[in-house]
């Protein structure tokens, strides 16, 4: 089966977003990251920044789940938590983007949302702690928290969110077609491996 859709799941700071963007450029296909968030924002009524900050949070019907919801948002007004409402919209948007044609989608549990499609290649990018810590400091600067703590907190949110909505273990090899260590291979080599995988599948 020809692989048209590539999903990139990743540990925070591993370079998965960069790898996905470069892969999309080499394949000449759309890359969905911020664009996906913008579409979810358009359909949900939430600001993109709010979605970025809350779509990976653990679900729950706490008071704060409703306080920050835009007035009149149907899902939230009907009793869904903000996290559940965003998940519903996010799934819909991912399916729409995949139906449009070949693309690379980063994060957002897209590997699970598109698990029933045969034309997808699902990748997970990880890296060792020192590599990731150095990378986020270079990209995002210092913080009151150590880079190691920031990495652990971000990864934990992704892990809990993924497990809740998919019933799977985040980062477990059996959930993906390939897992690549960017700190060992380097970002460029990761891109090349994924490119060759897509091309080999499409040439069969």
Could you describe each region identified by the protein language model?
Residues 30-41:
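Short beta-strand-centered segment that lines the nucleotide-binding/catalytic pocket of NTP-utilizing
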Residues 97, 103, 110-116:
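RNA pseudouridine synthases
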Residues 2-10, 101:
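Pre-Walker A (Motif I) flank of P-loop NTPase domains
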């Amino acid at each position: 089966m020809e692989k048209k859709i590539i999903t990139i799941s990743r540990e925070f700071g591993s370079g998965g977003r960069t790898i996905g963007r470069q892969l999309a450029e080499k394949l000449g296909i759309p890359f969905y990251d911020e664009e996906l968030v913008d579409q979810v924002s358009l359909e949900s009524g939430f600001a993109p920044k709010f979605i970025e900050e809350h779509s990976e949070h653990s679900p729950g019907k706490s008071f704060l789940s409703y306080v920050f919801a835009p007035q009149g948002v149907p899902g939230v007004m009907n009793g869904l938590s903000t996290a559940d409402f965003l998940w519903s919209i996010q799934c819909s948007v991912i399916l729409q983007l995949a139906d449009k044609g070949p693309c690379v989608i980063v994060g957002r549990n897209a590997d699970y949302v598109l698990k029933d499609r045969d034309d997808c290649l699902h990748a997970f990018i990880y890296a060792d702690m020192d590599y990731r810590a150095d990378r986020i400091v270079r990209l995002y600067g210092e913080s009151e928290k150590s880079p190691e703590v920031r990495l652990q907190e971000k990864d934990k949110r992704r892990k809990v969110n993924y497990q809740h909505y998919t019933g799977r273990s985040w980062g477990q090899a059996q959930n993906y077609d390939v897992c690549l260590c960017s700190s060992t291979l380097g970002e460029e080599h990761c891109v090349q491996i994924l490119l060759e995988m897509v091309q080999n599948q499409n040439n069969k």
